[in-house]
């Protein structure tokens, strides 16, 4: 097995005894408790598997690992983990990534509309969400907590300097956020929006049947409606942040793998920690938040237990590799 001694000591192994298996703890070679035997039996580990390792923690997402008769590494997963919220979120993420080209086609189309057209403003906002991983924000949070996202930004949050625009505002949990924008497309767009009356940044001009014009605000519902019309009814703007977190984590993990081959537990742990730090910087939160709420546990467990897979694909395109992992997740964990 490819795990170092420390990792092995955290688990359970088995030995053949007649026509059955006996399971032992690695750290003391004692037979496992009746409670652990009941859990292991529910995993239905095939008798033909060799090099079997079973998690000692009943809450571990990966409960057992072994090698099948064809030499392939196989897994058994925690049923509670499978049934949790992560199941639906990451099942949807694969389809979300596959649907991004449809959204991008719509945004290219709408970028050609007159500037203050509603869809053109929404297109600009979604491109910023994609590139800067901004939260959507809600007007109610802006009023109650003075916390903002892209749909609730005020003009007071914008600072225009030669060749650069800075957005500075309080985000979720009171965190101070600062975005430095040097892209001419975004700079030109924000400058145009600053010319409209009102304190809100993202607004558009609506014209009624009599030709009367009115300045309207773009809200989070408008953004979600645009996404659902152009990508699919199951998606929301929050999927962008899930996508961004997992893509950045994959990019960072592959980069760390190229720097340091994960051949032992210490290197694996360091590479994962650095990848979480890098992801947190991109999303402007902490590594703990990335791990708890955004990054797929399946990727983490896969890197810990099968680093050879990442070594083999360390030069892959990150999006293609993320799709490969998501496809594997849907097959291995969700049984699709």
Curated annotation (Swiss-Prot):
Record flagged with keyword Amino-acid biosynthesis: no
Enzyme class: isomerase
Reactions that this protein is recorded to catalyse: ATP-independent breakage of single-stranded DNA, followed by passage and rejoining
Pfam families for this protein: Top1B_N_bact, Topoisom_I
GO CC terms: virion component
GO molecular function annotation: DNA binding; DNA topoisomerase type I (single strand cut, ATP-independent) activity
One GO BP annotation of this record: DNA topological change
Subcellular location: Virion
Gene3D superfamilies, per database record: DNA topoisomerase I domain, Topoisomerase I, Chain A, domain 3
Family: Belongs to the type IB topoisomerase family.
Assembly: Monomer.
Function summary: Releases the supercoiling and torsional tension of DNA introduced during the DNA replication and transcription by transiently cleaving and rejoining one strand of the DNA duplex. Introduces a single-strand break via transesterification at a target site in duplex DNA. The scissile phosphodiester is attacked by the catalytic tyrosine of the enzyme, resulting in the formation of a DNA-(3'-phosphotyrosyl)-enzyme intermediate and the expulsion of a 5'-OH DNA strand. The free DNA strand then undergoes passage around the unbroken strand thus removing DNA supercoils.
Protein name in the entry: DNA topoisomerase 1B
Annotated source species: Acanthamoeba polyphaga mimivirus (APMV)
Gene: TOP1E
């Amino acid at each position: 097995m490819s795990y170092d001694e420390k990792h092995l000591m955290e688990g359970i192994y088995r030995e053949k005894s007649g026509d059955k298996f006996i399971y032992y703890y690695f750290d003391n070679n004692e037979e496992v408790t009746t409670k652990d035997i009941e859990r292991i039996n529910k995993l239905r580990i095939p008798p033909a598997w060799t090099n079997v390792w079973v998690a000692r923690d009943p809450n571990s997402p990966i409960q057992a690992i072994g090698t099948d008769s064809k030499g392939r590494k196989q897994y058994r997963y925690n049923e509670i983990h499978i049934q949790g919220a992560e199941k639906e979120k990451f099942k949807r993420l694969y389809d979300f990534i596959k649907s991004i080209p449809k959204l991008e086609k719509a945004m290219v189309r709408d970028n050609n509309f007159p500037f203050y057209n509603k869809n053109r403003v929404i297109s600009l906002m979604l491109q910023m969400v994609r590139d800067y991983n901004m939260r959507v924000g809600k007007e109610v949070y802006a009023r109650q907590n003075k916390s903002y996202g892209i749909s609730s930004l005020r003009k007071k949050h914008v600072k225009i300097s030669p060749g650069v625009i800075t957005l500075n505002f309080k985000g979720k949990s009171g965190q101070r956020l600062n975005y430095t924008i040097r892209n001419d497309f975004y700079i030109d767009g924000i400058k145009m929006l600053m010319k409209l009356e009102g304190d809100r940044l993202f607004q558009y001009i609506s014209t009624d049947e009599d030709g009367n014009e009115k300045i309207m605000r773009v809200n989070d519902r408008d953004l979600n409606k645009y996404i659902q019309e152009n990508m699919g009814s199951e998606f929301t703007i929050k999927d962008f942040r899930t996508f961004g977190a997992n893509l950045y984590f994959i990019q960072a993990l592959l980069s760390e793998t190229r720097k340091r081959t994960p051949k032992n537990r210490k290197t694996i742990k360091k590479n994962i920690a650095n990848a979480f730090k890098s992801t947190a910087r991109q999303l402007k939160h902490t590594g703990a938040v990335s791990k708890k709420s955004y990054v797929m546990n399946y990727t983490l467990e896969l890197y810990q237990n099968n680093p050879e897979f990442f070594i083999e694909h360390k030069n892959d395109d990150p999006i293609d590799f993320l799709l490969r992992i998501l496809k594997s997740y849907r097959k291995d964990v969700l049984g699709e």
